[in-house]
Regions:
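Extended, largely alpha-helical regulatory/partner-binding modules appended to the mid-to-C-terminal parts
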Residues: 70, 76-85, 112-115, 128, ...
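P-loop/Walker A NTP-binding region and its immediately flanking N-terminal helices
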Residues: 2-181, 191, 199
Length: 275
């Protein structure tokens, strides 16, 4: 089995080198913002975080709340990198070893939190801070929350905790009171459509602005969903993204159907209207 897998990987690698093929990367990952100024639709939060860093006024426990796909984890990762970059002169250092991510949906027990607390005691070897990003924090058990309280209230000076959740109401009040809370908003249709236009231009795709607007509306404020829909429609329509292609792919009634229906009503053409 190992030999078969090794051979398959070798063949794929050789094909990529020979024919210039590259694995497809979804737009949500390919265009994930690397800097605060690249984050879409959360200017108030990104400006607040940048000012907090520059004025050395950053809380050690932050809670990022909001719907899915609006930039909570992205902002957490940017923040984690930026706070260690301050005053550091090595351009090639990414401080990856200073950032720990925990998915509370699958690591929600007391033992998981105690293991995290044991790590927190160890200071970073490079950079100023160790950053602990706990995603879906509302999934922690009651006992896990209680075990986490003391560390969250009095963290070591080298530790920053960033908690992210889509369901703030499920987090116990004692945790909320220990965190600086940032409420992420849904991305507006205009902001999402504008960002999709930039991506379309980057990929040399001729995109109808109405089509991009339809995708943004369908995403319902989630930029990640908008990018996922964009990838799907591009796979369907190729390098030309039209209103008709988006309507067909997303099972949306095209605006022409509405106009035609209104015309038939005004003309009192009941048979054609029923058809």
């Amino acid at each position: 089995m190992f030999i078969f897998v090794y051979c398959a990987i070798s063949i794929m690698t050789r094909a990529i080198q020979t024919f210039g093929m590259a694995p497809f990367i979804v737009s949500a990952r390919k265009y994930r913002p690397q800097h605060f100024e690249d984050v879409v639709g959360q200017q108030v939060i990104t400006r607040t975080l940048e000012n907090a860093i520059s004025h050395n006024h950053l809380a050690q426990a932050l809670l990022f709340c909001g719907p899915r796909g609006v930039g909570k984890t992205t902002c957490a990762r940017i923040l984690a990198k930026k706070i260690n970059e301050e005053g550091h002169h090595s351009a090639d250092e990414d401080f990856a070893f200073n950032v720990f991510e925990l998915d509370a949906a699958s690591n929600n027990s007391v033992d998981d939190i105690r293991s995290l607390i044991d790590q927190v005691r160890i200071p970073p070897q490079v950079g100023r801070y160790k950053v602990y990003i706990i995603d879906e924090v509302h999934m922690l058990s009651q006992a896990a929350f209680n075990a986490f309280l003391k560390t969250l209230e009095e963290p070591p000076k080298h530790a920053i905790f960033i908690l992210a959740t889509t369901e703030k109401h499920k987090i116990i009040p004692t945790i909320l009171s220990r965190c600086q809370i940032f409420d992420f908003k849904r991305i507006t249709v205009a902001d999402a459509a504008s960002y999709l236009k930039v991506i379309a231009e980057n990929q040399s795709i001729e995109a109808d602005e109405v089509a991009l607007h339809m995708i943004a509306q369908k995403a319902d404020g989630a930029m990640r969903d908008a990018l996922s829909i964009f990838d799907r429609v591009v796979s369907f329509s190729g390098k030309s993204l039209t209103r008709q292609a988006v309507a067909e792919n997303l099972n949306i009634l095209d605006v022409d159907v509405y106009f035609k229906t209104v015309q038939l009503i005004l003309a009192a053409d009941i048979p054609s209207l029923l058809i």
